Every structure is written in structure tokens, then in C-alpha cells.
């Protein structure tokens, strides 16, 4: 059996060019650079923990994106981006869908109550020893036990950036 493929050489060249452009495009999911230094610092402390501040490590980005349902959703959008580029369409909407799926996956992971739970002092407030000031200080509790969520600033800041 013999197979012959006939295609427009210019169309094939254009498809290859579109796929190469897509290959050099990055969809970065997490805290965008516009989130500001304070939120990046808070996320770093939460991800890695802080023995001095008695904050346990609560990794969020990598575990959230590694969950099968999140990975599958992002992969589905990326496959659609490749198909769009191959058809000569702009894959931007599919790349945005991939980024949004990743950001939504991070928020869903936070909503699933990342262990360990908040300490009683974090939830209810109370007196704690401030090592830096070398004195006891009163900390107002946040009133609920949802790790990685207090004001909603960090939670709502998760997003994506597309770098071409």
C-alpha cells in the first residue's frame, strides 16, 4: 500500500511557523509578577514555612497543579491550543483557558483545606511570645480554620501570565 500526502507547501510552512511560535510561548501559573512583593513574600513563607514565626510548610502551587483533575484540565486546553495553531487560528484563547484552569485548580486546592490546620492562636487569637521583640504580644484571631486564607488577597491574586 502506498500513501501519498498532498498539501500546500505554503500552508505547511505557515503551520510549522505557528507551532514554533507556540513552542516558545509560556503560560506561567501562580502569582503573577503584578501581585506585588508582599504577596510573593507571604506565599514563600506559606510554601516553605517559617520556624521562627511557627508557621508550618503548606506547599500549594506544585501539589495543586499535580492533582490529576487539574493536570487533565490544563492538558486539555494546551491540546486545544496546539490544534488551533495547526489550523492557522490564534491559540491565545486556549492558552488563557489553560492558565485559568491552573489558577482555578490552585484555589480549589486551598478550598480543600491544606494540612496542617491553623493553630488555635491563629483561629481564636491570644497571647504569643514575639521572639524578635522579646515580649508577649496579643494576636487577633481570624475566626475560622482555613489555612492559606485570611483576607482573600493571596487567594484572589492567583492567576496566570502568557509570555510570548
Mark where each language-model region is.
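Short, Lys/Arg-rich flexible segments
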Residues: 1-164
Amino acid at each position: 500500500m502506498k500513501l501519498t500526502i498532498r498539501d500546500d507547501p505554503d500552508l505547511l510552512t505557515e503551520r510549522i511557523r505557528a507551532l514554533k511560535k507556540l513552542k516558545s510561548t509560556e503560560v506561567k501559573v501562580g502569582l503573577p509578577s503584578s501581585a506585588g512583593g508582599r504577596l510573593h513574600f507571604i506565599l514563600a513563607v506559606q510554601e516553605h514555612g517559617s520556624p521562627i514565626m511557627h508557621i508550618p510548610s503548606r506547599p500549594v502551587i506544585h501539589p495543586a497543579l499535580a492533582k490529576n483533575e487539574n493536570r487533565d484540565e490544563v492538558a486539555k486546553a494546551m491540546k486545544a491550543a496546539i490544534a488551533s495553531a495547526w489550523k492557522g487560528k490564534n491559540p491565545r484563547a486556549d492558552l488563557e483557558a489553560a492558565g485559568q484552569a491552573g489558577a482555578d485548580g490552585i484555589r480549589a486546592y486551598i478550598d480543600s483545606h491544606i494540612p496542617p490546620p491553623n493553630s488555635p492562636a491563629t483561629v481564636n487569637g491570644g497571647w504569643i511570645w514575639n521572639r524578635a521583640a522579646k515580649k508577649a504580644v496579643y494576636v487577633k484571631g481570624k475566626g475560622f480554620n482555613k489555612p492559606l486564607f485570611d483576607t482573600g488577597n493571596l487567594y484572589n491574586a492567583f492567576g496566570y501570565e502568557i509570555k510570548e
